[in-house]
Each structure stands twice: as C-alpha cells, then as structure tokens.
Amino acid sequence: NNCPQDWLPMNGLCYKIFDELKAWKDAEMFCRKYKPGCHLASIHLYGESPEIAEYISDYHKGQSEVWIGLWDEKKDFSWEWTDRSCTDYLSWDKNQPDHYKNKEFCVELVSYTGYRLWNDQVCESKNAFLCQCKF
C-alpha cells in the first residue's frame, strides 16, 4: 500500500474524496492535474462499492453527491469510464439512469444511498468528487 495518508487503498489504486464543489469536467481535469495517470474514480466490482461508500461517509465533509468517472459522452446510454477501463459493473439507483430532460450524462454517487448507488446528473452540476491515482 503506497497510498498517502487519508487516501483509500484498493486493488492497487488509491482513492481520495475532494470536498470542493466542481462541475464533472472540471473535477476530471483536477484529478488529471493532481498527478499523471489520475482520473475520476472507476468502480468495477460489487465488493468495491461498500468500501468506497464507507470511506466517503467517513471523510466527506459536505452533504453533496460525489462525482465518479462514468459518463455518456455519446449521449446514447453507452457509459464509459474516463480511465478507459471496461464498463463491467453498474450500480444504478432505482429508475436510473434516465437522461432526465435529455440533460444528464455524468454519474454521481447518491448521498441518500450512503454513496452506494449511482445516478446520472447534469454534468454542469457542482459536486464533491472522488479521484483515483497510482502512487
């Protein structure tokens, strides 16, 4: 585990919650600038969800939802991770994703589900965000 203090080590990567509220693209750029190879977090296994949820619940100071690195760039329900990893696991909240009013193309962890379930949201919304890095 080479993760710095207050980062969550998991499956060879390190995850950190940032409480500053940013639009989705700005959050992704922040993660990329933090260190080469960093992105908004991708989640791949059922087992990763509770660990990430618990970490966010412990460290997230605000009440906001939390951006992860999943988005629908083509706006056709073909969800992709910004780190280009395969979209092999999805954990949507009920009745999601819905592209509500055809405006929701970025994915957040939903606070009232304890950050376990996902919702598609307007990408310009300001949320806290979860970066993942290799150290």
From Swiss-Prot:
Q: Cite the binding residues for Ca(2+).
A: Q96, D98, E104, N119, D120
Q: Which UniProt keywords apply?
A: Antibiotic, Antimicrobial, Calcium, Disulfide bond, Hemagglutinin, Lectin, Metal-binding, Secreted
Q: What Gene Ontology terms describe where this protein resides (cellular component)? A: extracellular region
Q: Which SMART domains match?
A: CLECT (SM00034)
The disulfide bridges present are C3-C14, C31-C131, C38-C133, C106-C123
Where is the motif named Galactose-binding mapped on this chain?
A: 96-98
A GO molecular-function descriptor? metal ion binding
Q: In which tissues is it expressed?
A: Expressed by the venom gland.
Subcellular localization(s) per the UniProt record: Secreted
Q: Where are the transmembrane segments?
A: none
Q: Which CDD domains match?
A: CLECT_REG-1_like
Q: Which InterPro entries match?
A: C-type_lectin-like (IPR001304), C-type_lectin-like/link_sf (IPR016186), C-type_lectin/snaclec_domain (IPR050111), C-type_lectin_CS (IPR018378), CTDL_fold (IPR016187)
Q: Which PROSITE patterns match?
A: C_TYPE_LECTIN_1, C_TYPE_LECTIN_2
The family note in this entry says: Belongs to the true venom lectin family.
Q: Please give the subunit comment from the record.
A: Homodimer; disulfide-linked.
UniProt miscellaneous comment:
Negative results: does not agglutinate erythrocytes from horse, ox and mouse at doses up to 800 ug/ml.
User: What's the protein here called?
Assistant: C-type lectin BpLec
The taxonomy runs:
Eukaryota, Metazoa, Chordata, Craniata, Vertebrata
